[in-house]
Amino acid sequence: GEEWKTAFRTRYGHFEYCVMPFGLSNAPASFQALMNDTLRPFLDIFVVVYLDDILIYSTNELEHRTHVTKVLEKLSEANLFVKLEKCEFHVSKVDFLGYVIEPSGISMSPDKVSSITTWPRPASIKDIQAFLGFCNYYRIFIEEYSKLASGMLKLLKKDTPFIWGTDQEASFTSLKEQFVTGKV
């Protein structure tokens, strides 16, 4: 392996990580590449993978058992292991990466929707970026997202002073309402 790349020395000796440590700038990309390579035969056929979140989807229970077995075998071949307490097997409704996925369709996770109700009015450019970043993640559910966000987007233009006005308040309020009223 590549463990030598993480080596460091202290007065207590020479050390190398045996597992992927948190904090390395390329760790997420490297791990995603590993997961993609490991599960490549199944990607977009019956598997979606994002870092350590794996979604296995099937049309019936028998097919699902086969899919789960294939994925677990591939992970085992790559010396990757799952924690059973973090797994959900044979469910028809799952919360995955902030979305609720079920046979009837995809929706936003209710806890994400409820968090928007208490979101404070942005007081800086960074606050606007954080709010719009959150909203942008769910933009597929928000009709005319660009139009609704335009009031706040105006403040993100270069050399524009941060002055919160009626356009920005209307933009902020209408986006929050889209999440809360269920019109997403």
Where are the model-predicted features located?
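Short small-residue beta-strand/loop micro-motif enriched in glycine and branched aliphatics
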Residues: 15-19, 57, 115-116
